[in-house]
Swiss-Prot record:
Cited NCBIfam families: rpsE_bact (TIGR01021)
GO cellular component terms, A-Z: cytosolic small ribosomal subunit
Protein name: Small ribosomal subunit protein uS5
GO biological process: translation
Keywords, alphabetical: Ribonucleoprotein, Ribosomal protein, RNA-binding, rRNA-binding
Domain remark in the UniProt entry: The N-terminal domain interacts with the head of the 30S subunit; the C-terminal domain interacts with the body and contacts protein S4. The interaction surface between S4 and S5 is involved in control of translational fidelity.
UniProt subunit comment: Part of the 30S ribosomal subunit. Contacts proteins S4 and S8.
Tree of life domain: Bacteria
MF-aspect GO terms: rRNA binding; structural constituent of ribosome
């Protein structure tokens, strides 16, 4: 049986996943080198964008900056753990379709049937996998900037509401809601 190869080229660093002792899924979305020109030349720093989730509906993102890549990643992971938000999920998918945006990044996500998988690109995929979504159809339109895409995805996920929550807000029973 052939061994599975590691991703090469552009996919090499994309969506590195790690499970830590506390059961959180950590995903590295992007690492960027930033240069600042000073009198003596250029100073290089690194930024890291990470997403952390428990796979059961909690997710957060962090953005860290440092002179070294590992330090930037660690800072962003710590920030992501501090900013966890809860998302209403429906057996591994969303309750309803949702549109959202941040800056020029626009995202569209809709629930998918069992066996579809996560059909999403780049930064959106990292967020959806970390939060625990197993089946979803998603599309990013406009800017593909990873930070704005992560923010737009999280904003969209926060807008997803279960029928029970909608009914509670309206002071009704779930059966009384008009599904049509």
């Amino acid at each position: 049986m052939a061994e599975e190869r590691a991703p090469r080229g552009r996919d090499r660093d994309r969506n590195r996943e790690e499970k830590v002792d506390d059961g959180m899924i950590e995903k590295l979305v992007a690492v960027n080198r930033v240069s600042k020109t000073v009198k003596g030349g250029r100073q290089f720093t690194f930024t890291a964008l990470t997403v952390v989730g428990d796979g059961l509906g909690k997710v957060g993102f962090g953005y860290g900056k440092a002179r070294e890549v590992p330090v930037a990643i660690q800072k962003s992971m710590e920030q992501a753990r501090k900013n966890l938000a809860t998302v209403d999920l429906n057996n591994g998918t969303l309750w309803h379709a949702v549109k959202s945006g941040h800056g020029a990044a626009r995202v569209y996500m809709q629930p998918a049937s069992e066996g579809t998988g996560v059909i999403a690109g780049g930064a959106m995929r990292a967020v959806l996998e970390a939060v625990g979504v197993k089946n979803v159809l998603a599309k990013a339109v406009g800017s593909r900037n990873p930070i704005n895409l992560v923010r737009a995805t999280l904003k969209g996920l926060s807008e997803v509401q279960s029928p029970a929550r909608v009914a509670a807000k309206r002071g009704k029973k779930v059966e009384e809601l008009n599904h049509g």
